Amino acid sequence: MKVLHFYKTFGPEQFGGVEMFIRHLTHATSDLGCENTVLSLADEPLPPQQTPSVRMFQARQNFNVASTGFSWSVFADFARLAQEADVIHYHFPWPFMDLVHLAKGLNKPSVVTYHSDIVRQKVLLQVYRPLMHAFLGRVDAIAATSPNYLQSSSVLRRYRHKAQSIPIGLDQSLYPVADAEQVEQLRDRYGGRFFLFVGVQRYYKGLHFLLKAMQSAPWPLLIVGVGPMEQELMRMAERLQLSNVHFLGRVDEQEKINLMQACYSVVFPSHLRSEAFGIGLLEGAMLGKPLICCEIGTGTSFINQHASTGIVVPPMDADALHRAMKTLWDDPALAQRYGEAARARYLDVFTAQGLGQAYSALYREVVSRPSA
């Protein structure tokens, strides 16, 4: 089975949520006999690359508007690669992708992973909506990343007849193994126990509520990652005199796993539906950490089951975040039970092996349908 993935960004050094999803999915499906190709855009395209699980092609991005990359050359690249493929796998949202599909889709069997609604660009959404529905109406199957998102998305409501939920899964073997000595050094450096946030510092991550929750808190918080909100959040922490909040900036995968292993709990305060899933939260579950997140009707509270794997609180509620952190901090036995349950839930629901099997079955199903 030859599969062409199409998304706006993908490369060896990119670790955004969708890119990580594609990386873990292609690794899993290649073990099941799929030949995966990924086509994406880049300001400075790399030459084609081949790894054991995927071929990578990049077309030159000519310009970018509202997080949407455009490329004139990708039409020809897409048509050529689509001709070779048995099925095309799109990753939504990316409005330019819809245009390419409608122009060059070649009536190939097609699958869309619906990663997120378009939340912030409401004016542009009004212009884009007809193209979006033309695209979603033409594809053969749609997969949401959690049943929560499938049920709560007003866009997906129109496509229930061809939509299903396939949860994101992670392959732990693709991560480095935590360095035990460095893990102990981290615990010593930050007082033995600390809360951890890992992610890009974007507007929907709820980090300003987390900083408010840290006022008068006795426990340390480490914030890992960079992003457009970073400087504003650092100024806020300074203004609130939060000496127990530490911004670590960008870290590599080894450092991230060391921090995850060392931490007491993973806290994930995203407060808007732009946070469709939460890879950082799932990584915490994979490593057996108790979880804290907000109920926003998306995959965050599908990963984190309230009073089982951790605590789920209302969004935009700093007091509720503080109380959740205090509950775990004051009760190590409860935190340990939640962490063990989070690890068990990862193994039961969120492995890359399960992800690969589900998508391989979906590919076979759409390819076997009679042509329209």
Where are these regions (language model features)?
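N-terminal strand-loop element at the rim of the active site
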Residues: 6-16, 20-69
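A conserved mid-protein helix/loop that constitutes part of the nucleotide-sugar donor-binding site
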Residues: 20, 193-216, 228-234, 319, ...
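Donor nucleotide-sugar binding/catalytic pocket of nucleotide-sugar-dependent glycosyltransferases
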Residues: 40, 132-181, 192, 247
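Acidic donor-binding loop of glycosyltransferase active sites
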Residues: 86, 195, 261-276, 289
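Short His-centered aromatic/hydrophobic patch
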Residues: 90-97
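Nucleotide-activated donor-binding/catalytic signature segment of Leloir-type glycosyltransferases, i.e.
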Residues: 234-254
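Short hydrophobic beta-strand element within catalytic cores of glycosyltransferases
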Residues: 286-294
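Conserved acidic donor-binding segment of nucleotide-sugar-dependent glycosyltransferases
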Residues: 305-318, 325-332
